[in-house]
Amino acid sequence: MLEPVFVDTGYVLALVNEHEQHHAQAVLLAQRYDRHPVVATDAVLLEIGNALSRLARPAAAQIMADFRESVGSTVVHLTPELFDAAFARYQGHADKTWGLVDCVSFVVMRRMGFRTLLAFDQHFVQAGFVLARP
């Protein structure tokens, strides 16, 4: 079985939007990691839904349904304990511009042992993770 890969919002947005600056790289990453199981949080799915609600609502709905229904994907749900851990990280790094959803991802990735992810956000690098390369 292939190693699971964590998915960030920015990767999905770049994959869907051909005008996004990272689109070509996202397509290459999608090809490379096509058969890998994927992991995201429901907070990431909320960001995807919000970001695509006006321009690509059907695509957003399909992406979220695929994440929720596919046997090859795992959605980690936001619990009160997970929120508290992410919020503590958010508060504890006032010198960073990390978003709260990114902090949720950081906590989940550390707990699940992820080092590499599908993303273009340098905040993950600041937090000690590695962005996947095509």
Task: Describe each PLM feature range.
Residues 12, 45, 124-125:
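A generic structural signal for short hydrophobic patches within well-formed alpha-helices
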Residues 37-39, 71-74:
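Short loop->beta-strand "edge-of-pocket" segments that line small-molecule binding or catalytic clefts
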